[in-house]
């Protein structure tokens, strides 16, 4: 019996694509736009503190994002305190970007792991101010529950350090988070190639967020297509239900009516 599929919905908004992309590290704005189109994504993140607000025309990143098709998710990359993150979200709102935010409060410059205490603190403030908060967090079910209790619209545990491409390092913890919270779980960070995205989706998460895996590929547009297919295949595999793992082989051909010589 397969699992019944359900729409990917965040804060009452339903998305057809379960793939969320970033806007950084691409060889060019044109390639970024082509990747967004090829991937089928409907939501993209933008690092507010990296935006060149003086840029105009083709030099402006924002002019390469199709706001009619894509929901903007400003993020608080490079923030190391709750106060910085909250100020950055307020700036994004003032710039007319969005009240939806990817909350990212880092605790360490080397690993880029989240400071979960500051993340929860910022989440509580932002939710009270009416933001729809999607927090980048560790693969810890206790923190995930605290973020859900704070009013976050989803939780986004890392699969591995940001930009590492190490893949799904701790699938057990991702499963624990899925059992712990009722809001959507989105794997964020660590995906390196299409098989990583498929594995993440096979765990039962609602979506995958990535940037470097596509932007840093030798052929970003082709990788965007691969990621689209991987996310769809992983979701289908999760819904279909995999066979149990066994220690020994099991013949696939029936033995009834076997011809004996």
UniProtKB/Swiss-Prot annotation:
It comes from the Bacteria. It is an enzyme of class 2 (transferase). The keyword Transferase applies. Pathway: Cofactor biosynthesis; thiamine diphosphate biosynthesis. Keywords: Cytoplasm, Schiff base, Thiamine biosynthesis, Transferase. One of its GO terms (cellular component) is cytoplasm. Pfam families: ThiG. The keyword Cytoplasm applies. It catalyses: [ThiS sulfur-carrier protein]-C-terminal-Gly-aminoethanethioate + 2-iminoacetate + 1-deoxy-D-xylulose 5-phosphate = [ThiS sulfur-carrier protein]-C-terminal Gly-Gly + 2-[(2R,5Z)-2-carboxy-4-methylthiazol-5(2H)-ylidene]ethyl phosphate + 2 H2O + H(+). Its EC number is 2.8.1.10. PANTHER family: THIAZOLE SYNTHASE. Homotetramer. Forms heterodimers with either ThiH or ThiS. This is Thiazole synthase. It comes from Myxococcus xanthus (strain DK1622). The lineage of its organism: Bacteria, Pseudomonadati, Myxococcota, Myxococcia, Myxococcales.
């Amino acid at each position: 019996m397969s699992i019944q599929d359900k729409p990917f919905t965040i804060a009452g908004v339903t998305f057809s694509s379960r793939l969320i992309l970033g806007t950084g590290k691409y060889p060019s704005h044109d390639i970024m736009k082509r990747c967004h189109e090829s991937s089928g994504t409907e939501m993209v993140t933008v690092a507010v503190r990296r935006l060149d607000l003086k840029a105009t025309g083709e030099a402006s990143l924002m002019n390469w994002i199709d706001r009619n098709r894509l929901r903007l998710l400003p993020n608080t990359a490079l923030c190391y305190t709750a106060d910085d993150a909250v100020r950055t979200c307020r700036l994004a709102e003032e710039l007319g970007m969005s009240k939806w935010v990817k909350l990212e409060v880092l605790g360490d410059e080397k690993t880029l792991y989240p400071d979960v205490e500051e993340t929860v603190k910022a989440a509580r403030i932002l939710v009270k101010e009416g933001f729809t908060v999607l927090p980048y967090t560790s693969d810890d079910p206790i923190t995930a529950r605290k973020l859900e209790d704070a009013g976050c619209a989803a939780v986004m545990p890392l699969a591995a350090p940001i930009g590492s491409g190490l893949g799904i390092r701790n699938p057990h913890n991702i499963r624990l988070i899925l059992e712990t919270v009722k809001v959507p779980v989105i794997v964020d960070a660590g995906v390196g190639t299409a098989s990583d995205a498929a594995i993440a989706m096979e765990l039962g998460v609602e979506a995958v967020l990535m940037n470097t895996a596509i932007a840093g590929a030798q052929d970003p547009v082709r990788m965007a297509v691969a990621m689209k297919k991987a996310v769809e295949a992983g979701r289908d595999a999760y819904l279909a239900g995999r066979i149990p793992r066994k220690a020994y082989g099991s013949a696939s051909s029936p033995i009834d009516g076997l011809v004996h010589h």
